[in-house]
Structures are given as structure tokens and as C-alpha cells.
Amino acid sequence: MDKAKRNIKPFDGEKYAIWKFRIRALLAEQDVLKVVDGLMPNEVDDSWKKAERCAKSTIIEYLSDSFLNFATSDITARQILENLDAVYERKSLASQLALRKRLLSLKLSSEMSLLSHFHIFDELISELLAAGAKIEEMDKISHLLITLPSCYDGIITAIETLSEENLTLAFVKNRLLDQEIKIKNDHNDTSKKVMNAIVHNNNNTYKNNLFKNRVTKPKKIFKGNSKYKVKCHHCGREGHIKKDCFHYKRILNNKNKENEKQVQTATSHGIAFMVKEVNNTSVMDNCGFVLDSGASDHLINDESLYTDSVEVVPPLKIAVAKQGEFIYATKRGIVRLRNDHEITLEDVLFCKEAAGNLMSVKRLQEAGMSIEFDKSGVTISKNGLMVVKNSGMLNNVPVINFQAYSINAKHKNNFRLWHERFGHISDGKLLEIKRKNMFSDQSLLNNLELSCEICEPCLNGKQARLPFKQLKDKTHIKRPLFVVHSDVCGPITPVTLDDKNYFVIFVDQFTHYCVTYLIKYKSDVFSMFQDFVAKSEAHFNLKVVYLYIDNGREYLSNEMRQFCVKKGISYHLTVPHTPQLNGVSERMIRTITEKARTMVSGAKLDKSFWGEAVLTATYLINRIPSRALVDSSKTPYEMWHNKKPYLKHLRVFGATVYVHIKNKQGKFDDKSFKSIFVGYEPNGFKLWDAVNEKFIVARDVVVDETNMVNSRAVKFETVFLKDSKESENKNFPNDSRKIIQTEFPNESKECDNIQFLKDSKESENKNFPNDSRKIIQTEFPNESKECDNIQFLKDSKESNKYFLNESKKRKRDDHLNESKGSGNPNESRESETAEHLKEIGIDNPTKNDGIEIINRRSERLKTKPQISYNEEDNSLNKVVLNAHTIFNDVPNSFDEIQYRDDKSSWEEAINTELNAHKINNTWTITKRPENKNIVDSRWVFSVKYNELGNPIRYKARLVARGFTQKYQIDYEETFAPVARISSFRFILSLVIQYNLKVHQMDVKTAFLNGTLKEEIYMRLPQGISCNSDNVCKLNKAIYGLKQAARCWFEVFEQALKECEFVNSSVDRCIYILDKGNINENIYVLLYVDDVVIATGDMTRMNNFKRYLMEKFRMTDLNEIKHFIGIRIEMQEDKIYLSQSAYVKKILSKFNMENCNAVSTPLPSKINYELLNSDEDCNTPCRSLIGCLMYIMLCTRPDLTTAVNILSRYSSKNNSELWQNLKRVLRYLKGTIDMKLIFKKNLAFENKIIGYVDSDWAGSEIDRKSTTGYLFKMFDFNLICWNTKRQNSVAASSTEAEYMALFEAVREALWLKFLLTSINIKLENPIKIYEDNQGCISIANNPSCHKRAKHIDIKYHFAREQVQNNVICLEYIPTENQLADIFTKPLPAARFVELRDKLGLLQDDQSNAE
């Protein structure tokens, strides 16, 4: 059989499953299927080779040319199919979800035959099965029946009555095809009449031109002796139709003149077409328009479609074709419609008697549109772009369905819409609400019908495990407040916009009414309970009797107990670890969180809006029926307030809201601005103004529930508004964290609009105010209980990207306006700002930096300065550990001091420095020698901070400009060691494990103690009055000299050696005075001029400190609290290390202090191509990377992977890099109080243990792997960690793990030598956990494996240490591998799990310990 007869289309990337099925059938026919299904035999004979050639040739024959790269010459037929499978056989969950969505949205249209519909349906089912989905026969039948329109309801009902055992898909299809024939026969027997009357247009020229291209001679439709005979609807004879009937044409010609006169009496733009009878309502609804080529005006029969209209006085009389009949147009206006694109119709007439809507071809052409008729219908286009394509035909007349942008159009009672308005309520609850009379305006729900549509936000927010059997509640409560349940949920990250971490609920068991408060700390529970008891007891005039709670400490405080005793409230505590005993509150919290999570997901808002979602969820839950109530026909709200709630004001969470601006506006200023609906208040909607970053409460609004917010659009960036043109800045005060209530106008008592619950008895939010959210209220005029001015948009063309786009556009417009002229009143203030930016190290303003400097609101400029950072001053070439000094607001020069408010403090610091030099005899003033290099000098200023980040001392340092020194004349050796930060953590680990004391001393002017070997002359410093020919001959070292640090280190080391201290062989800045006992030994760590001393003998400690103070000018800081920017909190058996003050400064510096927190530093999927792009956005990426690296090296190992990955692209400086860096800041925002914990472990098994892992080929750019390892002391204290991209590409995961092991072994040996150097011995080999069995095998086995023969020799160093019993490798499952966090970005749950195991805990967690 040749290729043509087989009818197999060459594969071109489409329908791979069908193509593969046919190819396999062909290979089976050729008896060569075994070569693609079976394994190749050890001995390949000629028959196998022949079958292989045949199979490969067949597959290649049915591949299109563009896909031949899958079939290279050196691969087999089986490998070709495997390569194609890898690309086109999609069996992922995402593929299945996309196909299921298509299947659920599939509907049979009126133009499509049932056989074509079956074909599309079967293709989708086949694709689903190919994607790995399991679909039962009944599922296929159910999906098929769902796709059918209402005309098949009868046969569907009949099918539903059949037994499932007798039902097959083929049987159902057969019955449906029979039904299709019946429907078509019924349709032909009762042909619909579309046009009842024809009115001729008086504009005959237009009509003649319009029909010029039409065939005037009637076509002969039926040829031969056709069995099918047509019949004329006019004369009743067979063989022709009405339009070709000569009797009809004669009557039409006779009445032509009379009809034209009737049109002229009605209007000069007479209606040429009138629909009087339309029976096919499935095609044309209220927003359907018949396209009429003879009409001279548009006409509608529903005035709610108008967006703007005027009365026609007197009414316009319009004659129809039937003699003696007239209709009247009473309005004329504008209608906005949308099909694929928006179209606006002007001068549209409204006639109530019309049975349908008409769209005039003439009016469309006058508006510049072109209309093309073809067999499928009609296409309307403008300027070559398609605007509308008709979606249906009605008796060969084009009918176009639209959605109307009508402010007055009533909302359709859509099941999905009310589902979202009720906060994604369950379908059963919504139907129960419809059945029972629970609301004052219950009629709004009369037309609800159950929808089969799947709600994806509900799945994202609510999907859970199947329930367990519940015990029946046998408690019989007779009144409210008899039993109250309470529980706390949290901490929740990110924090809310007003910095809340928890929420607490109080549930009354009798009414099932819930009150929710947002709180920052668990200790706030008591004040919230007081508020609840006071308000609820006053409401009912009853007492709370029982309080059901768990054993949380927030409920067991002394003040809580005393309050309950005073009020006569009895505690009922649950058994520990048995939350089922407090099931009411546990279930309520679950319901609230699921509903809130779903609303945030559905609204596409940032997670920091969870607090508003929780309050809104509570508000809605109180208005939803509960099975826990004795009377299930009532809601908790009605049980609590004794009256029914209202529905009118319910709106979809996260909807776009247009707020009316009440302040006096310019003639052409906007009268509204956009915001986001986030909740309900007693007198209006609670809204988030994203531009001005504040909550507002308003009632004069328009709500667009179809337009949800995109999370990327809501950026909390400061907007510098212009003075008079940004009116909303006047409406609302500058405090972005307060809720501002707008003023309400007087309203009538009876109003048909939406009711806002102002009465204290109508709103639980009024009864129970959230103390943590103070509401600033202006004075209100008298307001009605049931009134509002809210209007609703059913659809909108606007996109929610406005939150960012409008902000950016406003900033651009302001910037352009300022650049047009020089007479800007803000110029002087801008120049002052520019000077201030220079003072803190920022260059002249440039554009597109993406950074904003926030002043205090009262001092903010009205325009946004475009600033950029000096890349030269903020490069990674600076020492990372000095990154914490970049935030000091200090003078940049000696002359600048004269203009500062703190002038006296700096002058005092300068005098102190000069006196120190005088006492120290640092220099001798002499005449300038000839032929000698003179080193320049300058003043450097800084501020020293305590552990809380508060300034404690102003420091002025006179430094030499070392770059003016000459090599081998002014200096030779310059290197000076400094202690590793891991050495500092090593000392702290010893301190906590062996109960040592650790103190700190600060060396004053440390470098001035160094002795110079060279003869150096320096220019006189500013502040000393002397002969200009004089210079300073340096007697001792001074800051800034290249050799100053080395000179100081040599002097300090010599002083310690005089006391018999010995320094470590692996870290020269660690010294030990060995007394044979760890508690009596003295350990010293030197970090430049900071000295850390640890010992268990305080007498030796004090003696040693006195010795140092005799040798050098020093400050005794006693117990260590703050070291190189790290805050140290000492407790009896724990040490906490944190850098919260520094993190806050970073957030402030980069304008991210009000950002939204995220749960991980980086997303689990990173776009490396965008990170590697050459786009230059002029953002301070390098400066930020340096700051993050300092945090990561000191106390935050959770940042290691993120900083390592992003620093690889620090030279790119593109927008993707900047966005990822800002995400790291957002993560820091949510973990400011994160602490690294060291604690005493009496049951430790290993003094040092390690974990090592690698991410094979994780770098998508160069495919190199990433090494990650960590080491702990005493099984808990984390002292070393590292992430590093490997130098070469690994051929396998085993090789990548082996290369990572090499790096870990080197670090382990360093720790071993460090312990040995301070006389602490290791009894056992250092244990390193590895999760790759192949790597362990290579390290343990000295024989050469095939897969390891190419590995570089240096990596076998790890094997040598294993053989020497220095290192012991032990396998660990991947799920327990702690080093996994150092190899790649992880999902949030896995990341948090490993972060906790590293010993990183936040404040509340550390307190719980």
C-alpha cells in the first residue's frame, strides 16, 4: 500500500498522539514493531538489522522536513520515537488541566453539525488519554452531554433514566444523532419569520449603490426533478420562493410610493428594516443586533443599553411596511458594545415596540467602517483591522451578539457572580440561600441556576483531604453567649499592610456568629477578648458563661485569668495536641482562611491583603447559612441581630472601583480615580488606593466586578504628586496607614439603591471595632439606613494594569511638564534634594533608575526626582564586610561640617582625634624636605552604632591618602590578616557549649599603634594652622597608609605573644592561652580593632583586659552585644545572632520598607536568559548585592543561594536582575527579626558534622553544577556554609556530587585544624552526609570506575581523606539533606522546613523555645 492510500500525513508538530498511533499500526503491519518496543538483543542478526532499517525508513518517510533533525543517522528507530515523545508527548498535570479546561468550555453551536462536534470531542478525549489522564466511560458520557444546548434536554433526561450498565458512548452518540434529525425536521416545518415589514429608505441613491454588486437575476436554486419542492409563502405555489414571486413584486411596486411618503413623515432618516417577530432566542438575545443593509439608522428596544441618551420630543413617528402601522422612537443616544473589539454606535434610536435591535450598514459606512458579506456571514472592519465578525445567522440574516457597556444595565443573576460575591461560597450553600427566605431582598436570587463551571480559585484555596468521621455535638445551648469558642491563627507571612501577623476569632456557639480581630502579637488577644465581652454583653444584656480554648499561653496569662474570674467566665481547655476538642473554632479558622485564600487568589492580589480578606470572609460567613444552627433557615447574622441581612451591597473581593472625587475640580480634571475593593465598612466600601498607598472608605463609587486586579499591577511605590493637579492627594491625608472616611451627602430615607449598614445593630464591624485599625472619621451629615450611589459595570475594556501604568504615566507627565520651562517653583527644592543626594553618595539625577528616595511625608517634593546610584562608588570591589557603613548620614568633607546642624559633635570628634595623635606622638611637624614624596591626607567621618542600630559615638578619623604612596619607597609589604566570620561563630559555639564568658574590647585609634619602618612625610591635615611649607614626618602608622593595618597587627600579635598566647595555624587572628582546661583557657579573636575575649575564668579575663589596657588605649565593652554589625543576645543556654537593624536600613535605603513580604528569596523557577541579557537599566544592583552578601555571610544562610545566583550576573545590571534583587528585599521584609541560634547540646554525638549536596547542571546558561555544603558543631550550631558554582561542567550527577564533596572536605579539614590548633581533639572522623550513592562509592572504592576516570586528580583528594579515616561519608535521603537549601531555589514549604532545621527562627519561634 503506497503512501497516498495510507493517508498518513507527515508529522508537522500537530496531533502527535494520532500520528504515533498510525505509525505504530503501520510498523505492526510491516512486522517491525518489535524494534521500537523491545530491547536490542546482545547479538544483532541480519533480520533485526533489516527490521531496524525498515522501521527507521518508515518513520522518517512520515516526518516533515523541519522535523528530520529528530532522526539523525546514528540513532535507532526506537530512539527517534523516544526523542519525539520527550517533546510532544505531554503527560504533565499542566497539560491535563489545560485539556480539561478546553473540554469543559466546549459547547455545540447552532452552526455546527453533531458529527463535527463529536469529532472535536473525541479528539479532546484522545489528547487527554495521551496526556496520561484516566477517563471512565461514564465520565466521557457526562462531558459530552454537558456540551449540548437546551434543545437536547429531552433526550438527555431520557438517557439519565437508563441503567449505567447499559450506557456506552457509542449508544449515546447514536441516540443524539437521531435527536438531531428530529430537531432539524421540526425546524423546517416551523420556519421562523424574521422580517414582518419593510420600509424603503427615501435615500434611493444609497440603496442603489449598496445593492449594486448584488446579482439582480434570480438564481435557479433547484435543478432537475428534485424530490424536494420549495413553496412560495406569498402565493402558495411550488417551484419558487417569495422574493422571486411575480405577484409579490407587483404588489410591492404598487405600494412603493405610498411607503416612501410615510417614511418622510416620520423622519428624514427612515428606518428601513423592522424586526417584529424573532423566535430563535438561542441566537439573539437583548444584546443581539440584526445587521440590516437597508436601514438608515440604528435602533434598539432596550433603553438600558444606552450609556448616554436624550429624549426625542415629540416622539419620532416611524412607519413599518404593513400599511397603516407605526412605531415611535422616544430617545436617541450612544450605545457601547463589545464583540471581539469595542464598537460605539451614535444616534441610536430607542423604540419600545420593536421586537429586536437593528444595526444600520449605512451608519457603519458613514463611520468609516467597511462591511463584507460572504457565505459564512459578515465581517465589519475599520482601517484594515477586524472589529466585529458575526456569530450567528437567523434565516440567512446576519445576527451579531454583543456585550453592552451600560452603566444602567441590570446585572444578570449569574451563578458564578453570586458565588464570588459571597466570597466563593459552596454551590450547596448558595442554592440553600436561594431556597430559603434569608434576605430582605431575596428576589435578587430568584433566577439562579446551578453552574457546572469549575472555579479555579476555589481549588487553589480550598482543596483538602477527604473528611474524617465527626462526633456528634450533644451539647444543647439555649441562648447566645452561653458558650464562646476562641482560637488564634498565625503567624502569617507576609504581614498585612498595617503590620499584623495573626488574627483571633470569637465564635458564639448558639448563633454561630463570628467576630474576627487582626493582631500583631499574641499578647493582644486579651485586649480583644475584653472588647468582645464588653460589646456582646451590652448587645444581648447577657453574660458569657463558658470560654472554650486551647492551651495557648496567650489565653493563660494572669491578666486573662483574673478577668475571667471577675466576669464569672469558666475556662474549658482542650487536651494538648487534640484540636478536635475545640472543633468549632478550628473549623471556623479553616473556613475563614480557605475563603480568604480563595478571594485573594481569585482577585490576583498580593498576599499582604490577607488581613482584609480575612475580615471580609468573616463578614460573609456571618451571612451564610450554617448547619450548626438549630434553625437552618436563618443566618448567623439574623440570629445575632434578629433581622435579615441585605444582599445588594455584596461585591466581588478585589473588584475595580471608580471613586468619585468630591473636592472642587478643574473643568477638565478627572472626576474619579481607581481603587480596589477590599472589604465592607458600616457606611461604605473599604477600598485600597494603590497610587497613594492608603485605605479609604467611600460610597459614591462605580464597581466593575468583571475587572479583577493583577498582582503585578499593585506596586507600593511612592508617587510624588504635583501640587494642584493631583486632586486625590488633597482628598486624603498623607498617612498611608490610616483609614480615611469620606464625607457622605444627605440621602433620603427610602432609596432603591444599596444599603450600607450604619446602624450599630446591623454590623458586627461596628459592634466590634478592630482596635489595631483606628478609623479617622470626619463629621457626617444625617444619613439614611438604606441608600447609596453605587453604579455597576457589567463589563469594561479597562485593564487593571492601571495601578502601575497610571502611576508611571503620572510620573512621566510630571517630569515632562517640569522640563518644558525654567520657571518651575520647585526648582530650588529639587536642587536642594540633588545636593542632599550627593551628600549620601548618589550622583546627579538621571532617568529610568526605578528607585525613589522617601522623605518624611511632610517634606516630600511634589515631583519625583529621577536619581541614579554611582556605580563606581557602589561596586562589588569594596570589601563586603564593610557594607554596613554605607548608610551613615555623615559629612563627606571637612568643609561640609560648617553647614550641618550637628557641627559641634563633629568638631568635638576632630579635636579628640587630634589630641590622640598628639598623645601618641604620631608625627613631628617639620619643613618640607626636598626630593621626598609627600603623602596627602583627608578627614573621614563615621558614626558608631549599638546593637539596636542607634548612634553612640561620632568618630572623625584622619587618614592618609595611600594611593599617593610609592612602592618600595613609602611601603613594601601590606597584607594584614583578619578573622574569618566563621571563626567568630566557632568561638561563640565553644562559649555556649562550655559555659564560657565572652567580652569585647574596642581599641582606640588602633592603627596609630603601628611602628613604621619607612620614612614617610604627610601633608598637614585640615584644622591645623601652621606654615604652609611645613609637613608632618610620621613617627607611627596612620590610617590610610597601605601598611597601616599590617603594622597594627604585628604590634598586637607581639603583645599577645609576650603573654604566651599562641595563634592558630589556620586563622592567625585567633589566639589561645592554653592552661590545660577549656574553662581556664583564654581565647582571643581580633577583627581589625575589635577584640573578642572568651574564657570560663573571670579572674583571668579581668587580668588580661587590664594588661591590654596598659599596652593600648582601649574601651572595655564588657559582655559582647554588638560585633561588626551583628547583634548578639546572650542567654543562659542560648545565643542569638541577628542583623535586624541593618536589614531595616537596607530596606529604607532602597525604598522597600513598605513592600509586600514573600515567603522565599527567589522563585523556584528562574528565567536565566533574562538575567543574562545585556539590557542596562542603571539600577544599583551591585550595591544591593554587596549589602545582601554581608547579611548572608554573617547571620543569614537562607540568603546564600539567592545571593550566589544573582551575583553571577552583577555585571549585567538589567531589569530582571533588579526585580529578583527586590524580591530578596521583600523576603527580608517578612523575616526582619530572623535570628541564628546557638544552643548548648549536652547529648551531642559529633563535635563537627557536615552536609554536602549539588544541583547538577542547574545553571541554564553554561550548564555548570552548583555546590552547597554546611557544617555544624555539637550537632546543632551552624558555623560554616557555602554555595559555589563549580568550575567545570559535570558529565553526571555523581560527578557533580563528587566535585562538591571535594569542597566540603577542604572546609572540614580547616575546621579540624582549627580545633586542633586550640588543643581540642577530635576522637572520631568528621561525618559528612551525602545523598548520592554513586559519589559515596567512588570515594570509598580506590578502584577506577568508568564514570570517574576523567575526573580531575585534585578531586580525588576527598577519597584520600576517606581512606585516611579523617572523613566518614554517610548516606542520607534527599528529603533529609539540609544542604539542599544551598544548591537551588526551593518551593516555599521545602525552603521553610530546611531553614528551620538550620537553626534560623523568628522572634515568636525563638520565644516559644
UniProtKB/Swiss-Prot annotation:
The EC category is hydrolase
Please give the positions of the paired cysteines in each disulfide bond: none
Zn-finger regions (CCHC-type) at which positions?
Answer: 230-247
Pfam families under this entry? gag_pre-integrs, Pol_BBD, Retrotran_gag_2, rve, RVT_2, zf-CCHC
Keywords from the UniProt entry? Aspartyl protease, ATP-binding, Hydrolase, Metal-binding, Nucleotide-binding, Protease, Transposable element, Zinc, Zinc-finger
List the residue ranges of the region (Disordered): 760-780, 805-851
Instruction: Outline the extent of the Integrase catalytic domain.
Output: 476-644
Q: Which domain of life is it from?
A: Eukaryota
Query: Which residues are catalytic?
Result: 292 (for protease activity)
Q: Name one GO molecular function term.
A: nucleic acid binding
Enzyme Commission code: 3.4.23.-
Q: What GO cellular component entries does it have? A: DNA polymerase complex
UniProt-listed PANTHER family: TRANSPOSASE, PUTATIVE-RELATED, TRANSPOSON-ENCODED PROTEIN WITH RIBONUCLEASE H-LIKE AND RETROVIRUS ZINC FINGER-LIKE DOMAINS
Protein name in UniProt = Copia protein
Source species of the chain? Drosophila melanogaster
Species lineage, top-down?
Answer: Eukaryota, Metazoa, Ecdysozoa, Arthropoda, Hexapoda
Q: Name the gene.
A: GIP
